């Protein structure tokens, strides 16, 4: 191969060999070609099986509560041959998985990434402080200093909404939240809040879910209300199989339906 290309691909390193700069570039390009081949093979399999296929989806904890159930229901009705492989986690973890080609798309909050990505908004959301309905702070206006006296369930400091929350306490000269439980996924947090007596910071959409509306309440403080967009993220230039495109289309339609229902509720 070196003779054919006319360039050194390996160099001596002690008793072994290591790649030269040209060798590293060739290796990276080879991996990209290999991934393209596998992607094309998957597409051919999907087409031969009637628009079926596997879509690897990363989903944020909040989206598993208010978006994912409706997405799965619609997919089963429209394209029952599509299979979802779901990873639930925080944005930072999911993005690492996407960069490694472990997942194809992310459904969750749209945040800034260092690597180039495509992002499609699906719906709007607000992150608010929540607690059980019998929490001492429930049902009355409270200050940041009041909340700093109680324990919290929060994600790691690498997660954007945790950084936003800490910044709000810091800028208002209040002690940072006293984190009693640090959690890797917010999917199980609503149940924990209801039983543990701890505060948390989570999607307002979850608080109106039938399962939690009688158990959880938003703590009355307008300073700690973080607006955000929720949508779909994938790597710029990534190949999207027909099955993946269908999941994206269904997710967008579910988001539109949710927004029109929310508007109707406000009008009523």
PLM region descriptions:
Residues 2-19:
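A short LG(V/I)-centered, amphipathic sequence patch enriched
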Residues 137, 151-172, 240-249, 255-266:
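Secondary-structure junction motif
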Residues 20-23, 57, 97-99, 147, ...:
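Hydrophobic residues within well-ordered alpha-helices
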Residues 52-115, 175, 182-183:
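Central regulatory/effector-binding core of bacterial HTH transcription factors
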Residues 67, 188, 217-261:
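A late-sequence structural motif
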Residues 28, 32-35, 47, 70-74, ...:
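Short beta-strand-centered segments that line the small-molecule binding cleft or hinge
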């Amino acid at each position: 191969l070196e003779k054919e290309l006319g360039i050194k691909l390996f160099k001596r390193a002690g008793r072994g060999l290591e790649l030269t700069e040209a060798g590293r570039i060739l290796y990276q390009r080879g991996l990209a070609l290999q991934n393209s081949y596998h992607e094309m093979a998957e597409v051919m399999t999907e087409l031969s099986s009637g628009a079926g296929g596997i879509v690897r989806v990363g989903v944020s904890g909040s989206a598993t509560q208010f978006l994912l159930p409706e997405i799965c229901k619609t997919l089963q009705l429209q394209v029952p041959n599509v299979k979802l492989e779901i990873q639930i986690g925080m944005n930072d973890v999911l993005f690492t998985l996407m960069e490694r080609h472990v997942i194809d798309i992310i459904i969750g909050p749209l945040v800034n990434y260092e690597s180039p990505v495509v992002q499609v908004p699906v719906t709007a959301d607000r992150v608010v402080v929540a607690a059980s309905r019998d929490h001492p702070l429930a049902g009355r206006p409270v200050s940041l200093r009041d909340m700093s006296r109680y324990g919290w369930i929060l994600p790691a400091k690498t997660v954007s909404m945790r950084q936003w929350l800490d910044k709000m306490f810091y800028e208002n000269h209040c002690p940072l939240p006293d984190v009693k439980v640090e959690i890797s996924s917010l999917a199980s947090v609503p149940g924990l809040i209801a039983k543990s007596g701890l505060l948390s910071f989570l999607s307002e959409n979850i608080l109106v879910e039938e399962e939690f509306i009688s158990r959880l309440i938003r703590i009355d403080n307008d300073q700690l209300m973080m607006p955000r967009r929720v949508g779909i993220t994938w790597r710029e230039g990534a190949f999207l199989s027909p099955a993946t495109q269908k999941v994206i289309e269904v997710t967008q339609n579910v988001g539109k339906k949710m927004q029109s229902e929310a508007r109707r509720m406000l009008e009523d």
